[in-house]
């Protein structure tokens, strides 16, 4: 049976002209970014799907102490409706105190499900250790689990992870350097010297010579007004300037696990001939037992019977002419009906032979 290869090919650039992109689509302003927040909290109100770990009891006891309730030292709370969770959220740039964030709540321990639970007040901290938001509320859990007395279990999706829309209240803003200094720096999403130069040239065409300069393949620095309100208007104009990105370098990306192959536009092949075929050898071992009659006085003997089968697949050869393009390469690969492992071997051999002009990346 012929194994088909999933071959995804980037043909768009070959069929239509390269389209200019807005600066806001290919670059980001340095320093304008989101920040990750994380916290440790308790979910209560679970219908017996919580956990009884020691750290859960300790966290629960600490919470009671914060409310002024002290349990005797010899009393251990029996709780099955409580779970210890990790809470995390992304804090967008320029968000202000009083605004809200969506939070994700994930079970840390052995809780079976968070469905029906409520997150109690949880402090969300940044990497600097400061508290930036406080999360609390009822969760939305898409998954569920059910378990019978005989141990049978049904689980759909992930019942130990939930979300709370607008579940965190921002208490502190993250300081931003956006309005400081004489420059704004744009960082390209994909570093490329040609694209960086084209961006600087496009900005200079709009603002005047020497207003922008490419620092390297990923960064373009622009003189900007110092006044914050003027800088906002200035950036609103700049981010809509259109730039024609440079062509990507020639690459062939191969995912050996899924069999996906992505071939870039500029991949070329030098003259080469490839033979595709394979030898399959199958060895099967079967044990035969010779059992004598009860009164014969003989011994039981075990013998091995080996069956060896060899098959040679039909070999095919295809020839790449000088300057072979992406289309010919794709058609040739499909013609031989190569499996993913065979295609990878062919591409590696072409690269080693110097016939493949492009970077071969295996992921």
Curated annotation (Swiss-Prot):
<dbReference type="Pfam" id="PF02119">
    <property type="entry name" value="FlgI"/>
</dbReference>
<keyword id="KW-0732">Signal</keyword>
<dbReference type="GO" id="GO:0071973">
    <property type="term" value="P:bacterial-type flagellum-dependent cell motility"/>
</dbReference>
<dbReference type="GO" id="GO:0009428">
    <property type="term" value="C:bacterial-type flagellum basal body, distal rod, P ring"/>
</dbReference>
<keyword id="KW-0574">Periplasm</keyword>
<feature type="signal peptide">
    <location>
        <begin position="1"/>
        <end position="20"/>
    </location>
</feature>
<comment type="subunit">
    <text>The basal body constitutes a major portion of the flagellar organelle and consists of four rings (L,P,S, and M) mounted on a central rod.</text>
</comment>
<dbReference type="GO" id="GO:0005198">
    <property type="term" value="F:structural molecule activity"/>
</dbReference>
<dbReference type="GO" id="GO:0030288">
    <property type="term" value="C:outer membrane-bounded periplasmic space"/>
</dbReference>
<comment type="function">
    <text>Assembles around the rod to form the L-ring and probably protects the motor/basal body from shearing forces during rotation.</text>
</comment>
<keyword id="KW-0975">Bacterial flagellum</keyword>
<dbReference type="InterPro" id="IPR001782">
    <property type="entry name" value="Flag_FlgI"/>
</dbReference>
<protein>
    <recommendedName>
        <fullName>Flagellar P-ring protein</fullName>
    </recommendedName>
</protein>
<comment type="similarity">
    <text>Belongs to the FlgI family.</text>
</comment>
